């Protein structure tokens, strides 16, 4: 049994729009209902990273990509593209297996990612933790 899902072309299109066109600050990616494909779920244009993270369900896996803006130690505005692997403890085992098996495949398709964040709950991902990763 192959537990790795294929990646829908719309995911790549939305990712390219994010990093090249700056159309949104973030995207959320999920599995299709049959777990055979990774599909685009939503774009995010809100104010804060915390608002973005709050869009992730507490009981199901998601992937995300976020264009994080920050100031470096010389007060220059910088951006880092974060790939987020969200796999809450409450997620069904089958979902976790497919999520884990597919993670590297999707990460490799999204060229230009600066950093990866793996989280199972909100204590493992916050604006302050992401800012720390930017240093």
Swiss-Prot record:
Principal subcellular localization: cytoplasm
GO BP of this protein: actin filament depolymerization; actin filament severing
InterPro entries: ADF-H, ADF-H/Gelsolin-like_dom_sf, ADF/Cofilin
Top-rank taxon, per record: Eukaryota
Pfam family, one: Cofilin_ADF
CDD domains according to UniProt: ADF_cofilin_like
Protein name: Cofilin-4
Organism the protein comes from: Dictyostelium discoideum
